[in-house]
């Protein structure tokens, strides 16, 4: 079974073509980083315009590389929520056009759920229930995945997402946008002494033991105050301490989620997982605690892409899921829970 995935939820335009939910035939991505870099963040109007300009070309390239025809497609999955409304509409219209011409079934899917489906493109077996850790520019949350298409929120961020915090701290340090890769590089250059004390606070230490929550806005503020009071501190030291404090909270929340649910199998996904310092730390923690943890090995699978949408579509289509042409898109995360 061959399916197409269309991803335009934010600032990547992507078409993916997948066989049986796990074999990649083609993946084309246009990243808008250079378009948004002058503004230090994503500008919705620029994002939707760029999707319009690039999506047809990517579609042609994906079809050519996969050596299939539109009549070979069993379904077209498209991200319908959450995301930037104008951007989502571009992908939705492309899916509708394919449906109208070729009568290909349409599957509007949840962007957040598709991040977890991408792991099956790397051979991770499907076994439920599983904990899902999602860390990206717009999300920092832990879910219980009961099956594809059904996940339960266990803990969310109370303010900024981790990816957003990376960008904001990078801005304070006058590092380029997006901030994640630059902070990771600077942090690797710093070698703390054995008895060195943290210069940034531990996050959410006073929460009840059973509560799973994220909060990163205070960490950004702490960096701002630190820069004002101790101008002599190196960027490398600040980056190392920022990552260490943020990753402490991620690790602590995973520990609480495992304790609370008894589930010892974790899918970790989202753009922040492209930080292999974080991946290595999570794998070390998982091994020590007899937890199975899976994260994308390829950085391209951490970021938004059409292959993950196509992979999720395969499993939903197997269960009989599809929608009429008049489906709607939504910026809201609330619609995904079932």
UniProtKB/Swiss-Prot annotation:
Binding-site list for Fe cation: 111, 115, 304
Cell compartment(s), UniProt: Cytoplasm
UniProt remark on cofactor binding: Binds 1 Fe(2+) ion per subunit.
EC number: 2.3.1.234
NCBIfam families: gcp_kae1, T6A_TsaD_YgjD
Family in the record: Belongs to the KAE1 / TsaD family.
Protein's name according to its UniProt entry: tRNA N6-adenosine threonylcarbamoyltransferase
Organism phylogeny: Bacteria, Pseudomonadati, Spirochaetota, Spirochaetia, Leptospirales
């Amino acid at each position: 079974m061959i399916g197409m995935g269309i991803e335009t939820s934010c600032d990547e335009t992507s078409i993916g073509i997948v066989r049986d939910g796990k074999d990649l035939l083609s993946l084309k991505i246009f990243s808008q980083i250079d378009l948004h870099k002058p503004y230090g963040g994503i500008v919705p109007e620029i994002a939707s315009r760029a999707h319009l300009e690039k999506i047809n070309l990517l579609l042609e390239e994906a079809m050519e590389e996969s050596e299939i025809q539109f009549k070979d497609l069993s379904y077209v999955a498209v991200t319908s929520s959450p995301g930037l409304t104008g951007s989502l509409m571009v992908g939705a219209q492309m899916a509708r056009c394919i449906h109208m011409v070729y009568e290909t079934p349409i599957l509007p899917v949840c962007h957040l759920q598709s991040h977890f489906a991408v792991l099956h493109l790397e051979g991770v077996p499907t076994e439920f229930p599983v904990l899902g850790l999602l860390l990206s520019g717009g999300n920092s949350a832990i879910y219980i995945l009961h099956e594809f298409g059904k996940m339960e929120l266990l803990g969310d961020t109370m303010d900024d997402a981790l990816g957003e915090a990376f960008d904001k701290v990078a801005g304070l340090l006058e590092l380029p946008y997006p901030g994640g890769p630059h902070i990771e590089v600077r942090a690797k250059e710093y070698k703390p002494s054995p008895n060195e004390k943290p210069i940034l606070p531990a996050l959410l230490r006073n929460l009840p033991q059973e509560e799973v929550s994220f909060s990163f806005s205070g960490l950004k503020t702490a960096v701002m105050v630190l820069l004002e009071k101790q101008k002599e501190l190196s960027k490398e030291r600040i980056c190392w301490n920022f990552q260490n404090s943020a990753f402490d909270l991620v690790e602590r929340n995973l520990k609480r989620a495992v304790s609370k649910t008894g589930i010892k199998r974790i899918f970790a996904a989202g753009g922040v997982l492209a930080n292999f310092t974080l991946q290595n730390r999570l794998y070390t923690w998982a091994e020590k605690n007899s937890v199975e943890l899976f994260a994308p090995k390829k950085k391209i699978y951490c970021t938004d892409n059409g292959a993950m949408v196509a992979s999720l579509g395969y499993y939903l289509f197997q269960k009989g899921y599809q929608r009429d042409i008049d489906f709607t898109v939504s910026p809201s995360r609330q619609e995904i829970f079932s």
